[in-house]
Structure formats: structure tokens, C-alpha cells
Amino acid sequence: MGRFDQRWVSVVVLAAGIALLPGLLYLFGLALVEGRPQPADRAPSGVAACSSEPRTGFQPMNPWSFATQFFDDDAMKKKVPEVEREAFWIARRHLWRQPRHDMVRWHLSSTALTIWITRNWSAAQIADTARKEDFCRAWSKRRAPDGPMKR
């Protein structure tokens, strides 16, 4: 094999590795999680939704779209959809119930589990579970104009 062929193979292998990296990190992050959370059957009646934001047209996350957000200035400025935020809360709560690990494993597994939840649960299941776990009340206190998260 000539020098040109070796360089070409190296470039192809490098490009394939970069393209596969988000998916491999997602699978590794899921492997770090013990079990998977179960969606709530229905939220208790009388418990308000976290947001009046419409849940139609919800697009499940995937490892590649998540990774590309870091390179897209417009995506970084956009508000995170409530469904994704609620999925993150659910993932975080599930991980709190497991043995603690270092920060890199925590972030990798919470991101992977958030992606998994958005891909395997409906928007209604995510909302019902967030309401049942009482995430909405805690979040609304932080968002209140005079709440603890005031800037």
C-alpha cells in the first residue's frame, strides 16, 4: 500500500471514529446506569403541568443532535424545550437513587438517560412523571420573579 493509500485510510478511519463517537458515548453512558426509570401511570389530578408550552411536534433527542448543539451558536441560545428539561429531571432523580460516581460518569450517564427517556417515552408520559415527582413546584419556585434564582 502506498503513502497516499495509507493517508486515505487514516482519514476515513478518523472520520468514522468522529462520526461514531456520540453514539458510542451514549451506549457507554447507558451501560453505567443501573436499570431504567418507569413512567408514571398518570399524574395525580389537581397537579398543575410544569408549563403551558405545547407538547405537539416533540422531537426525541439523539446523541448526534445533542453533540451538534455544542457547535451551533443558534442552538445554544434557544430555550430548552420543557419536555427535555423534564426528561433531565427524571433522569437525574433516577441517578440520585444509585451509588455515586465521579462527575464525568454522572454527566455522561445523565445525558444518556435523558436521551433514552425522550426516545422511549411519550411527551405525555414525561409530563405525567415530572408532575408526579413534583418537579413542577420546585421549578416554578426557581422561575418566580422574586424566587431564589432571581438575577
Segments and roles (model prediction):
Residues 2-151:
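Juxtamembrane regions of bacterial inner-membrane/periplasmic proteins
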